A protein has these predicted regions:
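Histidine-centered active-site/metal-ligand motif
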Residues: 49-51, 55, 89
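Short acidic-glycine-tyrosine-enriched beta hairpin
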Residues: 70-85
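Ligand-binding loop in jelly-roll beta-barrel domains
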Residues: 85-110
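Glycine- and acidic-residue-biased ligand/ion/polar-headgroup-sensing regions
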Residues: 53-64, 69
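Conserved GNAT-family N-acetyltransferase fold
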Residues: 38, 57, 81
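A short, N-terminal "cap"/entry segment at the start of jelly-roll beta-barrel domains
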Residues: 1-32, 113-125
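Conserved short histidine dyad/triad with adjacent acidic residue
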Residues: 36-50
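Short strand-coil-strand connectors
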Residues: 31, 67-71, 94
């Protein structure tokens, strides 16, 4: 791999994917892990879903309500969390936008291309 393909900026680039209305991601895939910079607009919802990948998240900007395994957690800039495989999770913003850095291991293969939706994740009921 060239140096150019190994260095990125949080504010630009990546593979663009609309996860839900008002929830947009820029994805940076690697061999064994994947980073996703997710911008969640005010009063938007990331549907509760589950997938086989472990996921870590860091709230970079703003605040939101993170729902994990049926429990609501108020997260603000600087907070981070771990979501084990197959645990239902999602969230919603309040009056301001939120930016979250998600880390997936292994990478979510369906996120290696631009598109929309949550890929092969199972929507929780």
């Amino acid at each position: 791999m060239s140096d150019e393909s190994c260095f990125h900026n949080l504010h630009e680039g990546g593979i663009v994917r609309q996860l839900a209305a008002g929830v947009n991601a820029r994805i940076f895939p690697g061999v064994n892990a994947m980073l996703s910079v997710v911008t969640i607009e005010p009063r938007s919802v990331s549907p509760v879903h589950a997938h086989a990948n472990e996921q870590w998240g860091v709230c970079l900007e703003g605040e939101w309500i993170r729902i994990q395994d049926g429990v609501e957690h108020h997260c603000k800039a600087g907070d981070f969390w771990q979501t084990p495989p197959h645990v239902p999770h999602g969230g919603r913003t309040l009056d301001t936008r939120c930016v979250v850095l998600d880390i997936f291991a292994p990478p979510r293969e369906e996120y290696r291309q631009a598109g929309s939706g949550l890929g092969d994740a199972t929507l929780a009921r």
